[in-house]
Amino acid sequence: MTKQDYYTTLNISNTASQLDIKRAYKKLAIKYHPDRNQGNKTAEEKFKKIKQAYEILSDTKKRNLYDQYGHSAFEQNNNSNNEFHSSFTTSTSDFNDIFGDVFGDIFGSNKKNRKEKGSDLQYNIILTLEEAVKGIKKEIRIPKLDKCQSCYGYGSAYGSKPSTCTSCNGHGQIHMRKGFFSVQQTCSTCRGTGTMIKNPCKICFGQGRIKKSKKLSITIPAGIDTNDQIRLNNEGEAGKYGAKSGDLYIQIKVKKHPIFKRDENNLHCKIPINFVIAGGSIILYSSFRGEITVPTLEGKINLKIPSETQSGKIFRIRGKGVKSVRKGFQGDLFCKIIVETPVNLNSFQKKILYQLGESFKNYKGENNSPKSKRFFNSVKKFFNNFTK
C-alpha cells in the first residue's frame, strides 16, 4: 500500500519552515485529536498519520533523510522496533502541548535569547540523465558566511565573553504594559540576542562569522529529476552571534539527452527503421530480420518486431525505465517506431521498387494498404456529397 507523502499529510510544501510545520501540525492535531473525536476511528487514524509526519519533518536529521530517500529511509528494518515509527499514545497533556505556545509562535516567543537563524542558500547542479538515473557523488564548493573559528561564532575576542544585555536582562524581549494589555517586543539594544559584545573579535569584527568557501561532498540519490531539491541541514550561512546556521538547498536540473526523453519514471525513445515503399504499401526492412537492437541506460537489448509494423507503433519494455527515488518501483521504456522513407535512390533501386509495385494486384496497392484505401474512399465520398 502506497504511503502518503508527509508534506501532503500536513498540507504544506516541501520547502516549509519549521515554524510552518509546527503551525500546520497544531492546526490538524487539534482538529483530529481523539479527545475531540471519541469513538471516531477515522479521526484516530488521521491523527496517527499527522503525528508521524510531524515527528519526521520536525527533526532536521530525519527530514533531511526523508527529503533524499522518502519513506524508504525509515523502512530498512521494516519492523515495529524502527526508531522512527513510535507507538501511538494520547493523553490530556499531549492535547495541551498542541496548544502550547501557539500564540507565542505567531506574536513573539516568550523564550529568552531567541537568535536569528542564518540564511538558507541554494546551489544549482546540472546532471546528465545517466547520473540522475544511477545516482552519483558530487564535490561542490559553496561561498558563504561561515562561523568564525576565532570566537566560535559568538563575536567576542578570545578570552572574553558576551555580557548580559542590561536593557532586557538577557531575555531578548522587553515587556511594555499599556492599560490592561502587556505587549512583548524585541529588545532594540541587543536585537533579541540577550547579550552585548564589549570586546569584539578582531577577525570577524564582532559578527561571529566570516566569508569563506566550503567544500562539500553531495550524494545524489538514484532516480532524482529536474526541479527536485536536496536539503542539507545547517550547511547554509551561519547565524549571527552563535545562532544556528541556515540550510543548503541543492536544486537539480537534468540535461537533455540525445536519445531518451524522461517522463517521470518512464523513458521514451524513437527508433528509425528502413522500409520499401511502392504505391503506398509499406514493408519493414526489419521484418526480414525479426528483431532490432534497442538502447537502454543499462546496455543494449533485442526487440522483436512483428512484420508489417506501422510507423508510430509503440513498444513497451517493462522495467527499463527509471527507479523511483521515493517509492522504489521501476519505470518502463517506450520505443516508438519511425518508418524512414529512403532517399537518394539510384536507377537500380528505383527499378526494384517499381517491380514491387507491379507485383501488387493493382498499382495503387489498395489490398496492401488498407488504411490508405479507407482514407481515399472517404475523400471520394466527401467530394461526391460536396458537389450535390
UniProtKB/Swiss-Prot annotation:
Cofactor(s) recorded for this entry are:
Zn(2+)
Sorted alphabetically, the keyword list is: Chaperone, Cytoplasm, DNA replication, Metal-binding, Repeat, Stress response, Zinc, Zinc-finger
Q: Which residues bind Zn(2+) 1?
A: C148, C151, C201, C204
Which residue stretches are annotated zinc finger (CR-type)? Answer: 135-213
One biological process term in Gene Ontology: DNA replication
Q: Outline the CXXCXGXG motif repeats, range by range.
A: 148-155, 165-172, 187-194, 201-208
Q: Which PROSITE patterns match?
A: DNAJ_1, DNAJ_2, ZF_CR
Q: Which GO terms describe its cellular component?
A: cytoplasm
Q: Which GO terms describe its molecular function?
A: ATP binding; heat shock protein binding; unfolded protein binding; zinc ion binding
Gene3D superfamilies from the xrefs?
DnaJ domain, Heat shock protein DnaJ, cysteine-rich domain, Urease metallochaperone UreE, N-terminal domain
Q: Which domain of life is it from?
A: Bacteria
Claim: Zinc is one of the keywords in the record? yes
The UniProt comment on domains reads: The J domain is necessary and sufficient to stimulate DnaK ATPase activity. Zinc center 1 plays an important role in the autonomous, DnaK-independent chaperone activity of DnaJ. Zinc center 2 is essential for interaction with DnaK and for DnaJ activity.
Name of the protein described by the UniProt record: Chaperone protein DnaJ
Q: Which organism is it from?
A: Buchnera aphidicola subsp. Cinara cedri (strain Cc)
